[in-house]
């Protein structure tokens, strides 16, 4: 009996050590947990789009002096025929303001494009909201917009700062539908150029940062993205302001950036498109939302195939693979390229060729003036 007791006492620390190690092994941060799927299914890693495409949503931040030969080499690998630089005026420090006030920036960028690859790059211009509300702001902004269009701008890009960060000369938030901007939207319509407008951010950025928030990891790793209803305004308020602009200016073509942040609510987005035939959407930075609802997303692309454009946003060539795979293949259960954006797995939509052609280039050729169509099939 005594020997048995001694043996058991000897085993206690061993068992304690073992269970302690096991408990430690079972604890890890969410960022660390990255299981490898054991699912054996077909996989198609597409490094090149099936058809030449127009990237309607891209940013290059040094276009006046950038080596465009190097850039086109990377574009050719992807089968990107035309890149649209939305940052036509850059974002430079002018008289103490980081803004788009430098009128020479766009001119120099256009000169670089014309001298080297005039058929491969287009640019949208931007307007400065510095001194907004002061007398003469509207006339000055309209004159600069017309000058840039005369110099080759194919559209106007509005950053998300409108409605969120920009303030007028009295220090008040500038709503997206501020009536003092009506002349800008109307001018774009008369010039026959589209307005690509980014309003708000993903709605989860406004939700409580708790265990129920799908964007918890993104907010943890990027805390500056967290929003509050009173700072600067609620998500619903900003989006409704944007939609009010769409309805009020039906002779102007608008492209809602990032699917209007409604890729997770395609029914609501469909209602908006039905109501506003002047509105288009593009898929930059929301492909993960589409990839987790392949059947509904495919139905949406089929129904609204004439209203969707291809866009990527950040220039990271290796990430285009994800877009091609979601749009073109029927692959199952594959990861997104940034866990903090989407920790879930995705599925391909396997879009038919005619829908792919419209998304990749036909729709952009139709609504953006003066593009070279020679690189695209019929």
State the predicted function of each range.
Residues 100-225:
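Active-site gating/metal-coordination segments in enzymes
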